[in-house]
Regions:
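Flexible, glycine-rich active-site loops centered on histidine and acidic residues
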Residues: 123-170
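Glycine-rich, proline-tolerant flexible connector loops at the mouths of alpha/beta enzymes
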Residues: 65-95, 149-159, 225-242, 324-326
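Active-site mouth loops of central-metabolism enzymes
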Residues: 36-53, 113-124, 194-212, 289-302
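Glycine-rich, positively charged N-terminal anion/phosphate-binding segment
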Residues: 20-28, 50-57, 61-65, 69-108
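Active-site pocket-lining/capping segments in soluble small-molecule metabolic enzymes
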Residues: 146, 159-192, 197-206, 213, ...
Length: 338
């Protein structure tokens, strides 16, 4: 069971049963409690859970409100045939999130939120994921379209799958209403799923403009999304403007900021390109001074710590940390915020 720090303890009434409650209830619990949450990656196939559990143990000191478990579509590999041509095959390098989510929740007593994505999945496969999660008593999920395959220029839906997050939401809503994807009634419907979605303070890379991007977020809220968590960002001003514009068009769900400390020198150029996020000028100036991984790590810790402090000062009580390749940095930021 995770250790509880006084300044970050959840309301006792909530904490007793938070493994089986709507995450948005935790996010809107009131009282000024500061909530951390963390996102982790399933282990590579064949490597076991020891390293993952060791990582989670490092975060348990901060009494996380919940832990997200990512999922990724299969990757393409090329196999040479006898005739000299190449065949493109899908290979899955990491297990799905269902078993990992159950193992984390049972071992650590922390609410878990597995990701369910359109990418690489059929509607039937998603339906079985929902059934498995319901059997395990996991009621919170994050619904995402997922990234395009590495070799594809644009997102290509899996045959029999979904093209958009809204299609995935429709399937989950039908399941919640007591129907399988083919319209067959579920004889013994279980508890309904609560779900969150993603949002983008600097616009999704495929959105025509910010207004259209916000329109789709509003649509997801109206379809039933309980909260949204942002893509990582380094400029709080963009987050505040995004939230302001969202509220102006009637988006009322919690918008949780996603923070990822820079942890090594290569990330100073890779992160803005891969995640389509800008460095504010102050960060860019300091980034150019970094000569080593340690320089970049220290800058990342200091910048993210100050980001979080500004968010707290502005009344944001829930912060979500992206931990991949930044576990120790995230832990240090969280420690400084206690």
């Amino acid at each position: 069971m995770c250790k509880i720090f006084r300044n970050f303890v959840l309301v006792n009434k909530i904490r007793k049963d938070n493994k089986k409650m709507n995450i948005s209830d935790i996010l809107t619990s009131g009282g000024g409690e500061k909530h951390f949450s963390f996102e982790v990656l399933p282990p590579l196939k064949g490597t076991g859970t020891e390293r993952l559990f060791s990582t989670i143990e490092k975060f348990c000191d901060f009494d996380p409100a919940y832990i997200n478990i990512t999922t990724h579509h299969s990757e393409y590999v090329y196999r040479e045939l006898e005739n000299g041509q190449y065949e493109r095959l899908r290979v899955r390098r990491r297990p799905g999130t269902v078993a990992i989510a159950a193992a984390i929740q049972n071992k650590f007593g922390v609410p878990v939120i597995p990701h369910i994505i359109c990418s690489g999945a059929t509607a039937e496969a998603i339906e079985y994921e929902l059934i498995d999660l319901q059997f395990l008593g996991i009621e919170n999920v994050l619904l995402l379209r997922g990234d395009k395959a590495r070799d594809d220029s644009q997102f290509v839906p899996t045959p029999g799958g979904h093209a958009h997050t809204t299609d995935l939401i429709e399937q989950v809503n039908r399941f919640n209403e007591g129907f399988f994807n083919d319209g067959t009634p579920i004889k013994n419907p279980g508890k309904k799923f609560h779900y969150g979605v993603a949002c983008y303070p600097e616009k999704h890379e495929e959105a025509l403009n910010m207004e259209m991007d916000l329109k789709y977020l509003k649509m997801k809220q109206d379809m039933g999304a309980d909260y949204a968590v942002t893509q990582l960002f380094y400029d709080n001003r963009k987050y505040f403007r995004f939230v302001e514009k969202a509220r102006e068009i009637g988006i009322t769900i919690p918008i949780v900021p996603g923070i990822k400390p820079l942890a090594k020198l290569s990330q100073l150029t890779v992160v803005p390109r891969v995640f389509r996020c800008d460095f504010p000028q102050e960060l860019a100036v300091e980034a150019l001074k970094c000569k080593t991984d340690d320089d970049a790590r220290q800058l990342g810790i200091e910048w993210s710590t100050e980001q979080c402090r500004q968010l707290y000062k502005a009344g944001v009580n829930n912060i979500h940390f992206y931990t991949v390749s930044a576990v120790d940095s995230v832990r240090e930021v969280a420690r400084r915020l206690l």
